[in-house]
């Protein structure tokens, strides 16, 4: 949705997409089955219930990001950047590595998406046209997030054990967080409104909260008194898992009774299993911050639900707890 306006970007998807992907004129308002050979992004005027404009592509649209100024269309191996007007005006076009999850984060001026090499993040400045590259991981990317002020970028790879924090525009690493030791699929990364915390969800059905450093600082060693492993974090020759920075607080969220929801080992180097669905699976663990102390996690699919969590401090330590939930399709 374009802010709080009447315009919505729609893409047909799933096994039987009902929003038209074939030829649509502005006066068409009927729901029809899609033409599998044509792939479109529709800009829908919800007030007049008409398609205001559309873009057509030869391959499936993995994801769309939209603001009041720009429309970003993510294909499997390409990202197109358009000025939002009728018709949309293309201003940039970039090849990417395979991107079946449609990874893309859009800020006010910065667009972050995978580069042409595995593990790379490209940051495009819509105001200047300048590009920056971060070599973030050795493995394919699984998640990307921009901070509200666009001065930090969070990344995770398909290994899912580490989350890295980068300063922008310097593109230097300022922190590295350990989600866990076992591999996992990261579902979502999201900065709090004031960028003091980073929330992370994974297919381990866990929500992690990490406290963030100032983007102008460099990495510092954590206080052993507040570290998960205490004084062991300072012992030499121990595996790095003992010295890494862990979440300040964690709690469980519900994946729901979704067939195959936890079986998300699909590599980002392969195509999605279900046409029209990024990553080939229903969205799970999508994070949204309502304010600096309240999180909502949304899951789609057959067992679609939202859960509300509150983040706070008690006895000098961070905590996160569930406040409510609802199955929103019932």
Describe these PLM feature segments.
Residues 4, 51, 60, 100, ...:
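WD40/WD-repeat beta-propeller blade-loop signature
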Residues 4-5, 68-70, 107-108, 150, ...:
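Conserved loop/turn motif of beta-propeller repeat scaffolds
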């Amino acid at each position: 949705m374009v802010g709080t306006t009447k315009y919505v970007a729609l893409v047909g998807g799933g096994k039987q997409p009902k929003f038209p992907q074939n030829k649509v004129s502005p006066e068409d308002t009927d729901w029809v089955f899609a033409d599998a050979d044509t792939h479109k992004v529709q800009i829908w005027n919800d007030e007049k219930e008409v398609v205001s404009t559309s873009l057509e592509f030869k391959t499936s649209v993995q994801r769309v990001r939209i603001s009041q100024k720009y429309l970003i269309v993510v294909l499997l191996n390409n990202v197109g950047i358009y000025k939002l007007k009728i018709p949309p005006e293309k201003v940039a076009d970039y090849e990417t590595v395979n991107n079946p999850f449609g990874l893309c984060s859009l800020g006010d001026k910065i667009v972050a998406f995978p580069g042409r090499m595995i593990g790379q993040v490209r940051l495009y400045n819509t105001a200047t046209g300048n590009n920056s590259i971060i070599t973030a991981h050795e493995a394919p990317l699984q998640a990307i997030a921009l901070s509200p002020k666009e001065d930090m970028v969070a990344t995770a790879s398909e290994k899912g054990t580490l989350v890295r924090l980068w300063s922008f525009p310097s593109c230097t690493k300022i922190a590295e967080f350990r989600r866990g030791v076992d591999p996992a699929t990261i579902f979502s990364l999201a900065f709090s409104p004031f960028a003091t915390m980073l929330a992370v969800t994974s297919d381990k059905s866990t929500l992690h909260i990490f406290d963030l450093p100032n983007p102008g600082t460099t990495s510092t060693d954590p206080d052993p008194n507040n570290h998960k492993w205490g004084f062991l974090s300072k012992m030499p020759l121990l595996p790095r898992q003992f010295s890494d920075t862990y979440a300040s607080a964690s709690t469980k969220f519900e994946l729901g009774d979704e067939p195959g929801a936890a079986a998300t080992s699909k590599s980002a180097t392969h195509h999605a299993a279900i046409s029209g669905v990024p990553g080939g699976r229903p969205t799970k663990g999508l994070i949204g911050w309502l304010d600096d102390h309240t999180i909502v996690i949304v899951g789609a699919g057959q067992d679609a639900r939202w859960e509300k969590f509150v983040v706070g401090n008690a006895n000098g330590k961070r905590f996160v707890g569930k406040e409510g939930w609802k199955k929103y399709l019932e």
